[in-house]
Amino acid sequence: MRIMFLNHSFVHHSATLETHIRKLLAGYASPDTTFELAYPDDLGGGAVLSLLEERKALSGLHHILETPALVQKAIEAERSGFDAVMQSNTFDPGVEASRLAVRIPVIGLLRASLHFAASICDRFGLIVPLETHMPHTMRLVQAYGMAPFVCRMKSV
């Protein structure tokens, strides 16, 4: 199986970090599964992202702005023969829109993690990187129908 591990940002990781990510992914997969790291093109959201980062106002808008580039990359993955796309960002940017555009599975880590947690316990908490992420995260949790399982959310 060949899976595209799609970074949400057009900013490329260092070679050292990419090697580390590949090792982590290989540790979770069967021997015949390969992961290829991919990055979307900057279709104009980069300037807005930089401004939001400067203001420390990352509220989810930046993920919405990334969606067209992520959908474009999912279409490219399907055309290139990938069996699936896995979104690297835990806020699942572009996942729903990409699912509408392709016939291969597009996996969002947040949704997959929420459902896994709900399969092994009745209630769980979430940790998000910034307090400004909390409203967007809760909207996603509610959209996924998982709010009854989440007992608390905290930023680090």
Model-derived regions, located:
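General beta-strand structural signal in soluble alpha/beta enzymes
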Residues: 37-38, 86-87, 106-109
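Periplasmic-binding protein-like
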Residues: 79-89
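Short, well-structured alpha-helical segments in soluble
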Residues: 53-81
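Short alpha-helical
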Residues: 92-93, 132
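N-terminal glycine-rich anion-binding loop in soluble enzyme alpha/beta folds
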Residues: 1-64, 129-156
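Short, well-ordered beta-to-alpha junction loops that form the rim of enzyme active sites
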Residues: 8, 88-91
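Short, acidic/small-residue loops that bind anionic groups at enzyme active sites
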Residues: 97-121
